[in-house]
């Protein structure tokens, strides 16, 4: 496996309270460092990540770089940032990347190292391109560039930290038993998260990106690519989640329109090393 990046100085902690007792925001948690029982404030970027960074979760975090703002201020601030979550199941540890920005960094590293089979030897690329067409498209996409054949491409990256034996609602999951299932037979799914109504789309922004890529593809010769970065290895397939029918239908339409799908699997170690596993995890739709 090829190495993509390393997060240095990781320490393990257990989330004690979230939101923090001291800073009332869901992005800050009170975390106890496992090695010395010290209680610290940790920044968690992903609103609990559906249990992966909630109370009781074991996480891996790194010190937040010191700046003039947080060293000269008397105000409380986060000393650590949470990057990874540790799942313990059937005497096995699975390390899951939950910091959203990691997905873009991992994708860029894979792009530079020619590991993405659909985007080898690109001539040029850049991060964060805004595309605007009045009444049609108005979004910032993660990558754009020129491929090895001289064709322009746009690529949007989505972080996929979640997986389960079946992609079903929490209510249905309580009725099922997965004790006899292979631990590595889970389905990775996107999107998932909080919403006020079950009929709402989970991520309006993600839906907008997908629909706009479909539109751009239909209107031009630009290659439009969705890259789903699956930051765990206990999976054997990916699918647009059944809990968001609107996104699921948009995904199907995007594929029909010619939008290319990359499903990149990443393996993390407790030392903070990230490795490229594959970019063609089977898709179920």
Language-model segments: what does each one mean?
Residues 19-21, 88-101, 117-177, 202-211, ...:
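Active-site metal-binding core of divalent-cation-utilizing nuclease and nuclease-like domains
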Residues 176-245, 265-267:
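Nucleic-acid nuclease catalytic cores
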Residues 69-94, 98, 279:
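OB-fold/S1-family single-stranded nucleic acid-binding modules
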Residues 19-22, 62-71:
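Short, charged beta-turn/beta-strand-edge "cap" motif at the junction between a beta-strand
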Residues 21-30:
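Short aromatic-glycine-enriched beta-strand elements
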Residues 6-21:
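Structural detector for short beta-strands of small beta-barrel domains
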């Amino acid at each position: 496996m090829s190495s993509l990046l390393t997060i240095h100085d990781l320490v393990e902690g257990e989330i004690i309270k979230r939101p923090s007792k001291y800073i009332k925001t869901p992005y800050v948690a009170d975390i106890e460092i496992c090695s010395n029982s010290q209680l610290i404030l940790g920044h968690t970027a992903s609103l609990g990540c559906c249990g992966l960074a909630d109370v009781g979760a074991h996480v891996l975090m790194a010190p937040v770089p010191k700046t003039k703002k947080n060293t000269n201020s008397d105000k409380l601030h986060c000393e650590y940032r949470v990057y990874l979550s540790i799942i313990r199941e059937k005497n096995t540890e699975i390390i899951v990347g939950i910091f959203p920005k990691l997905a873009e960094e991992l994708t860029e590293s894979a792009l530079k190292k020619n590991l993405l089979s659909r985007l080898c030897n690109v001539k040029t690329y850049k991060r964060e391109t805004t595309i605007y067409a009045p009444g049609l498209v108005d979004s910032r996409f993660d990558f754009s560039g020129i491929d090895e054949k001289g064709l322009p491409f746009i690529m949007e990256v989505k972080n996929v930290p979640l997986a389960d034996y079946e992609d079903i609602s929490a209510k249905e999951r309580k009725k099922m038993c997965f004790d006899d299932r292979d631990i590595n037979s889970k389905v990775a799914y996107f999107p998932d998260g909080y919403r006020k109504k079950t009929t709402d789309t989970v991520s309006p922004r993600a839906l907008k990106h997908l629909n706009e890529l479909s539109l751009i593809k239909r209107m031009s010769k630009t290659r439009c690519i969705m890259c789903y970065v699956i930051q765990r290895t206990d999976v054997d397939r990916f699918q647009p989640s059944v809990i968001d029918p609107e996104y699921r239908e948009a995904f199907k339409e995007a594929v029909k329109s010619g939008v290319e799908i990359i499903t990149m699997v990443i393996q993390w170690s407790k030392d903070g090393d990230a490795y490229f596993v594959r970019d063609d995890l089977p898709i179920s739709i």
